[in-house]
């Protein structure tokens, strides 16, 4: 990804002696790569392919994590992509409205962004497929680049089809003026996805996997996985099963170590990673997702994306039995209370005894009601009671979710003397940020 398109000098304009005056000047710009000469050398072809992948990257991370039109870029993990999590957006966060509000207009900024994002990949892939033959590449490189371009086009059309169920189909380079095709059916788009993936699978020069070589690029295993998902959408389940089995034969496999160790730099090239976007600590190649997921003491986050309560409840007890809130000591009346009334169990200690927390107490009572608060709140032990609900559960729970009152290490610039905050617990209602413990 680091070898992205950059402005480079291509040399001076050359005058040619010719009987036809119209061709006397080479008008290729000297300060940038034009579409006319993009695919003319192996070096430029490599840059052109890298440029397609660059489309996935969010170049606006410094804008913050709020889902606004000016912040959208790349894979859009704070918008549509975040809805692929099992998440609770807060009620007025824009993406969640896509799930419950009326049909969106074609010019809706979130809908428009996804359309533009996918078709940028489609048209860039079409350009590569049509012009790679002009670059003077050796056969193995040419065939690999062709397969990568076919895969990326299939990936983009697959995403478009999931969102829109049929879109205009372009398989060759076109000008803006000629982008006038009408909607193709969802079945036609899935057929294109399958055809492009089959091209990759049948190409002898396309690697089975990219676990150790061509890291971050697609492979036959990735093509089998993508084609299998297309078959699933078409309800051709036997074909899908066959493709998913082929993924394993390509060298991919499930992670066999501890769950928490999977998400470490030394294991980022695990055989379970089929086609993954990866980041680097180097400035410009990192990610800011911890700010979106974290609270105020995690780089000033707003917990924009939160795990859904139902998703967390799916984590079973350590012995494999189903988790039941009413079986937690002190929470026997859980099922008799509304969601808002249950907020009393998540309150911090000291709301009755600390005058400094008077406004926080009022905030809690406003949500759960004074009767419920007086009956269930423990001034000393409220935190321990709810914390116990997350003990003795599937160990992956605390490896995935920051559970209530579980201490974590945080950092936010200019707080706590600009030092790490060790053993920080998010207490609710919030009183003060920027301290350890």
Each model region followed by its residue ranges:
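Short acidic-aromatic linear motifs embedded in glycine-rich loops, typified by GG[WY][YF]DAGD(H)
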Residues: 22-148, 155-172, 176-180, 187-191, ...
